[in-house]
Amino acid sequence: MDTTVSGVGVIDKSMAVIDALAQGPCSTGELVDRTGITRATVHRLASALEMHGLVRRSGDGRFALGYRFVSLARTIDGLEALCDAARPHLKTLSEQSGESAQLYVRDGDDRVCVDVAESAHGLRTIVAVGARLTLERGSAGRALMQPDAGLVTSVGEREPGVASVSAPILGQDGVALAAISVSGPIDRMSTAPAERFGPLVLDAARAVGNQLGSLTSSGLEGDDFDGHLAAG
């Protein structure tokens, strides 16, 4: 988690709450554990952020990042076009696979989830929009780092019991603009998830890449996302 301190207490604590929720939904008690902030303060901050749409309550009552981050993120150059192009393919990928599908872009040494299509299963992978994850662990991170590898898989690598398959979304010059991923419980994905889900992921990545062809010709490159995403 980012531990940057600005000296403005309420801002620093609010960002600590946001960074904690970027790891996934959590209860008030879990927020206290993740941030080190007192229970009363963390609940007050989360409730205030909820009023502004930056935090929401998930179906089970836990706090999660709010959907306002989606509209804020879309103001970043090129990201709105990326999400618009990818969204129908994310939805199709989730429906065809029965699992959750995610779209990631690179930001420095991290990857940031910028869109999701969640599985209808009760037991499913949940990655919040705005979640910041390391590039080093998980298939999507490696797909962004090594676009020439094509299809990348992960089994219990980032989170025990979870498997994923990812592929880079390439621009016209082979630059990785983003990565698209499908993930779910190993019990359904199996320990060789590429065998069943790989073709679906590759088809989705290629379809989005084809739609984004005009972006690279207008000056958008994969590194243009680097360093411009907020840590939501």
What are these regions (language model features)?
Residues 165-173:
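A short, hydrophobic, proline-anchored segment that marks a local hinge/packing element in signaling
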